[in-house]
Amino acid sequence: MKPEISEQPLKGLFGSESAYRVLMYLENYDNGYASQIAGTFDISLSQAQIQLKKFEELGLLVSRIEGTTRMYYFKRSPVSDALRIFLRSMLDVLPTPTIRKYYRQRRRPRRYGKR
């Protein structure tokens, strides 16, 4: 049985729950956009946008327009690489209900004809 941790210290470490959620989402799914992140965690769209913009200005994230959507990704740098290692290790010890609720969403449609 794996050890499980509380999310509370992580929220404090990153300064806010929305900052914590944004970074954990991007680490788990590799990319994302503001409304997708906001909908997953039931936070306001503006909070997700503020956090994404803040992390982009700090140099942790990069974004690009894909169609009409601004997608965010981790920037390749020693700082963001170290942060991602930390975030991945935290994802590995989150409580199982939290993992199921937030970090195991279907990202593609089901194959046609699958039963």
List the predicted regions and their residue ranges.
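Short, cationic-aromatic polyanion-contact patches
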Residues: Q8-A19, Y33, E66-R88
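Pre-recognition alpha-helix immediately N-terminal to the DNA-recognition helix
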Residues: E17-E27
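Key DNA-contact positions within bacterial/archaeal DNA-binding proteins
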Residues: S46
